[in-house]
């Protein structure tokens, strides 16, 4: 595996196909809050304060001077109310950190904080930055999902595209939603309700097993709440196939129920990235290196199939096979998203979301990307693996892929 060389100033960027000499982007540490359910332990914490908790939790563990940070990049969806005004910058200042450090907020829908990590890695690889804090924050209890879109109704926009002549010319006025997309996926890949219920139940079972085994202990920072210290994800539920079978479909005549969907959640996550020069100058010990970052897109009507071509693209770019990947985190926005991906990519199901996914653990939108990244890193270390791959479906049909190599 690559090592940090005191004399190195640049290394070939793996998989770029051009032989360009660029610096490595090292993963120094990654943390997250436990995920709170809607109305749960984190519901009363202002989003700015929630983000500040993640930054503090990260930097307290890494013991780096906050003034050394070149930029703070945070993912957040529905940037209105307490999540407006560039929450990356506001939460950094709320944490008490230096005013001279800038911040920027990213919205790539559900993949926002995964994209934040990618932007941070790109800044380091290009040599324009040495230390980046990347992550995400979302309080869905305070700012409900799609708030930014529903606010537009007062200005005459019933959807982001309802008045776009060019959009209507290309896609018509058909429904564009994650619910329809999930149903279309289930239909195209012939996924039965019973299969999706079994998958969803497995997510809860794996999450409970991971919590009992302490798999998340090192990645979760403690949040002091009015009811005491908060350290355990609130989402996993004791369920059964019988209970799931009794639920009504999300749409009339559909196959999907609430049991197959990710949970509305609150949380924050943070990752520290550094160049090899910063590793040497600040005495840092990397846990991994960024091996590959990319994003691709697919049909916006199906919306959630992007991880399939995105994964193929990433594997082709790096020359890796799916069997070379030791652990995978793919966001469980809905059960059919992961199940279709498994059918197409032919990954070992045991390696995919081995500690449960968003169906059980929750999906705090803008924070989920860095949350999954954090869990992937911890799992790689736990099993002694080399490569981890993360991918997420996103609104509009896009998908990110990140591959890391454990050091």
From Swiss-Prot:
Pathway: Steroid metabolism; cholesterol degradation. The active site is at residues 110, 363, 393. Turnover of MeDODA-CoA is low and FadA6 may not be the physiological thiolase responsible for MOODA-CoA formation. Belongs to the thiolase-like superfamily. Thiolase family. It comes from the Bacteria. It catalyses: an acyl-CoA + acetyl-CoA = a 3-oxoacyl-CoA + CoA; 6-methyl-3,7-dioxodecanedioyl-CoA + CoA = 4-methyl-5-oxo-octanedioyl-CoA + acetyl-CoA. Keywords: Acyltransferase, Cholesterol metabolism, Lipid metabolism, Steroid metabolism, Sterol metabolism, Transferase. This is Steroid 3-ketoacyl-CoA thiolase FadA6. GO terms for biological process: cholesterol catabolic process. CoA binds at residues 178, 237-239, 262. Its EC number is 2.3.1.16. It is an enzyme of class 2 (transferase). InterPro entries: Thiolase (IPR002155), Thiolase-like (IPR016039), Thiolase_C (IPR020617), Thiolase_CS (IPR020613), Thiolase_N (IPR020616).
């Amino acid at each position: 595996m690559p090592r940090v060389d005191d004399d190195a100033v640049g290394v070939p960027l793996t998989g770029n196909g051009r032989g360009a000499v660029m610096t490595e982007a090292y993963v120094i540490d990654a943390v997250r809050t436990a995920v709170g359910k809607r109305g749960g332990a984190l519901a009363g914490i202002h989003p700015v304060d929630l983000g500040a908790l993640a930054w503090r939790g990260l930097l307290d563990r890494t013991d780096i001077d906050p003034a050394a940070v070149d930029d703070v990049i945070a993912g957040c969806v529905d940037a209105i109310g307490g999540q407006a005004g560039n929450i990356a910058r506001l939460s950094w200042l709320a944490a008490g950190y230096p005013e001279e450090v800038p911040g920027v907020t990213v919205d790539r829908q559900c993949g926002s904080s995964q994209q934040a990590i990618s932007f941070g890695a790109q800044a380091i690889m290009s040599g324009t930055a040495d230390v980046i804090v990347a992550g995400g924050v979302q309080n869905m209890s305070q700012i409900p999902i799609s708030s930014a879109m529903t606010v537009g109704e007062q200005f005459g926009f019933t959807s982001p595209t309802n008045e776009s002549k060019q959009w209507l010319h290309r896609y018509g006025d058909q429904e564009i939603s994650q619910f329809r997309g999930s149903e279309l996926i289930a239909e195209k890949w012939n996924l039965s309700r019973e299969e999706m219920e079994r998958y969803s139940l497995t997510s809860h079972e794996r999450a409970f097993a991971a919590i009992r085994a302490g798999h998340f202990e090192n990645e979760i920072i403690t949040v002091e709440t009015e009811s005491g210290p908060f350290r355990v994800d609130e989402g996993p539920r004791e369920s059964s196939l019988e209970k799931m079978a009794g639920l009504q479909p999300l749409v009339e005549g559909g196959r999907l129920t609430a049991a197959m969907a990710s949970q509305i959640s609150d949380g924050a996550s943070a990752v520290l990235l550094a160049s090899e020069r910063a590793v040497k100058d600040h005495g840092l010990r990397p846990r991994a290196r960024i091996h590959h970052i990319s994003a691709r897109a697919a049909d916006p009507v199906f919306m959630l199939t992007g991880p399939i071509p995105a994964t193929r693209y990433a594997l082709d770019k790096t020359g890796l096979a799916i069997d070379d990947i030791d652990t995978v985190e793919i966001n469980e926005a809905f059960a059919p998203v992961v199940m279709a991906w498994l059918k197409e990519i032919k990954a070992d199901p045991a390696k995919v979301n081995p500690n449960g996914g968003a169906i059980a653990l929750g999906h705090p939108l803008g924070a989920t990307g860095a949350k999954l990244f954090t869990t992937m890193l911890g799992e790689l270390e736990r099993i002694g693996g080399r490569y981890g791959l993360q991918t997420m479906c996103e609104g509009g049909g896009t998908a990110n892929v990140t591959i890391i190599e454990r050091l």
